Structures are given as C-alpha cells and as structure tokens.
Amino acid sequence: MTDIVIKQKDNLHIRVECDDGIAYELSQHFTFDVPGAKYTPQYKARKWDGKIRLFSVSSKTIYVGLKNDVIDFAKKEGYSWECEVEPIDCNLSKQQFTEFTQSLNFHSKNKKIDLRDYQIDSAYDSIKNNRSLILSPTSSGKSAIIASIIRWHTSQDRKCLIIVPTVSLVSQMYSDFADYFSESDWKVNENCYKITSGAPKNNTYPVTISTWQSVYELGAEFFDVFDCVIVDECHLAKAKSITGIMEKVRNAPFRVGCTGTLDGTLTHELVLRGLFGSVYKAVTIKELMDNKQIAGLKVNCLILQYSDNEKQHVKKLDYQQEIDFLVSHQQRNNFIKNLALSRKSNTLVLFNLVERHGKPLYELINSSADDGRKVFLVHGGVDADEREQIRFITETERDAIIIASYGVFSTGVSIRNLHNVIFASPSKSRVRNLQSIGRGLRNSDNKEHCNLYDISDDLSWKSKKNFTLEHAVERIKIYASEGFTYKMIKVNVTNGK
C-alpha cells in the first residue's frame, strides 16, 4: 500500500491520503512562526500561538502549490508516494506562444518593442504549469509579462483578475496596457475595467484590475467568473488578506504571483508558493545591468556626522524618539534640500512621515527652487489620478523634483526619466529598499545610470550604535549582496546650515 497519495481537491487545495501519523508529521513540517506575532493582541491574549499551519490534519489538505514540497517530504522521509495531480494541458508549445506574443504588436511610447526572452519564458511557464510565482526584479518589465499572460487567456475566452497593492498601480497597469497595445485592435477601454475607491465592483469585462483592499470583503460570487488571477507585488500582501481572496477565486485554475524579492516578505514564502506555485526566477538585476536593459546604479552612502552633545542626547532615546529627532533636525533637512536642489535632471526624494517630514521637506525645497523648476509632493492623501498625472509630467520634464512617501513610490510606480533617488528616511527593509532603488533603474534615452544618495546618521556614542545607523549597515549589506557599486562618504551635518 502506498504511504502517500496526492489528489486534487479543488483549484486551491490538494488532498493527501495518508495515515494519521504521517499527517501529524506533515503538519509539523509545514508549520512556521509568523514574524512579529508576539506583538499581536491575539498572541498576547494567548488565543493564538503565533504559528501558521499550512497542512490541515483534520482534512488532510494543503495548498496546490506545495505539491512538490509534499513529494520532497515523502522522498526525504522514505515514504512511498503517488501523485494524481496534473496541470490543465493548454496544448501550447513554447514556439507557438512566442509567435503569439509577436502577433500582439507590443509598443512602448509609440515605438514597436519585442518582449525579451525571459519575459516570454516567464509568461509561458505560468500558462504551461497553470500557476507560477514569478521572481523578477524591479525594472524587468513585469507589466509586459502580465500583459502577455492576460492576452493569451482572453484569447481563450478566459476572464482575468489582476490584483495590485495600491490605487496608483491600478492606474499605472491600465496605462501600461494602453501603451503596449496602442497600435493594436485590442483596446484597453473595451477590455479592462479599473476598480478604485468608490467605483462600482464590475466583473463583466475580460480583465478586471483592482487593489486587494477594494475586493477583499466581496462575496465569493464576485470572484466566480474569473478563470485566472494574477497578484502583482504579492510580497506586500498580508497572509490573511491574500489567502482570503485566493480562496474566494475558487473557479480559477490559473494563478500567478509576481514579486521582485522574497526576502523579508510579509507573507511567508511557503504561503506564496502554496497559493501560486513554484518560484520561477526570471532574471536578476545584475543580468539586466550587464545586458544594458536597465540603467546602471551608483550608490553614494552619505553618513551624516553630529556633535558630541547630540550623540550623548540620542543615546538615551528609543527608536521612535530617534526618528523624531532626525525628522525635526533643521540642519539635516537643509542638507537634504541642498542635495536635491543641486542635482541635475529629475530627482526623487523618499520619506516616511507625511506630516512631520514630507510636507516640511516639500515647503523647504519648493520655496528655494528656481522659478520654473517643478516640485511635486506625493503621498497617500494625494488623489490617484493626480499621482498618475504627476508621473506623466515627470516623464517629459528634465529637472523636476518629486518628494514622495515610500508607501506610494517605493512599489511599482514606473518613471523612466528619473536620474537621482534620495533616501531621506532610514529603512532596513530589503524589499522596500530594492523596490525604491528600482524607481531609478528604468532606461531612458538620456540616461546611462542612476545616482542613489543613501542618507544615514552616525549618532553613535562610544560603543553604542544608534538604531538608524544599524539600519544603514543593513542597507549596505543589501548593496554588496546585489553587486552594486557603492562608496561611503562622511559629511558634517552642519553643511546643511
């Protein structure tokens, strides 16, 4: 008798037929601690142990995407196994799909473009295997990959749901599709519907684009019409919201997740692989740079130096108090102002706190800018259509400054004509930093490389390092691991008088 038999339960789950002893082993194998769980009310009230269990002992089910992990478990533990789960045969060869993408007549900025090999390969893998977790870095053209996927499925009379993390990205995805197919009979306004705040929840178009916040609380009947679901920037989703939506899209055998990185994800990699399938590594940032498909990057780590009195003051502060000290430091803000104004070409200044840092920086920079130089402030409170308009304006400007919140501009927002990026606020998140860097890596006709100015603050006193300096060390480790060229420059904060 076979120890483990894997069968299809539905489009989201497989059933593992095995005895109870093996079921408990599988449960342990697919259990992990949730980062930060100990800070949640449920954990503190002892109503939850802070773990996620992906294998259900009672129903003996687990996500379809972890099928290969179950097989690996069986092999490792010496159990005999059978798998009766097979993807839907799309009867599509790689050559046929390549020819199909060529027939779509992709354009960008009114110029005909050909999809790169890794874009075609990524899209084809998701169709052939019915599901895929596409790992493709910022500036690699994920929207073109998604466009080719939805064009194939809609050509087969399948409806597609695209889920993105922000309202800005709903507008941008829609605009990208309009750009790609501007010379095609396939018109975006006839085939795609945007769900934004206050808009009717329409699912009658071939393609629906929405944030997960806009559809999370809708009933399963809204999702029943979709055959394919694609989640962009899926690393940003919290486990509860993303699994809730994916469980409602019960009639969709085709499931695709796109992400630029799996390091430090809010949703554990096992959950993402379970929901979307095996990881498909499309390309690396280094490969894109080596092939001149994205701009080069020069990282300047600017380490601000402070007086002994300030260092002794900060050593007594907790993390939040240190942040408060930095964002209200007039000389530091003046330094950021002078740096932004002295840069040539378009510059993006990224901050964390809107009221206490973003708005003061905007007022400081805008009041000192030369007449005619455009300075924009972008944050979550700015209307999505206005943000999209600012993005388009910047594409045609040569010397604009965008002061933007990390939350809005660190993810997905595409500006080709961007030459300088300034990190005005500290962060150690690998995901956020790489996504933010990506804002400046897109190629344009007048750019060979992007300059990143990473501002950090050395407020260490004797052997005690301040919190944000430790974050800076983590960012430098990221630059080294990605193979970026960087240099470290000490600057006296009084230079920002």
Q: PLM ranges: what are they?
A:
Residues 235-300, 479:
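Post-DEXD/H (motif II) to motif III coupling segment of the RecA-like Helicase ATP-binding lobe
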Residues 314-352, 356-367:
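Conserved interdomain hinge at the start of the Helicase C-terminal
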Residues 168-194, 368-372:
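Conserved helix-turn-beta segment of the N-terminal RecA-like "Helicase ATP-binding" lobe
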Residues 128-152:
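Walker A/P-loop
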Residues 439-473:
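Conserved segment of the helicase C-terminal RecA-like domain
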Residues 224-227, 404, 413-426, 435, ...:
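A short beta-strand element within the Helicase C-terminal
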Residues 87-135:
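Conserved pre-motif I regulatory segment
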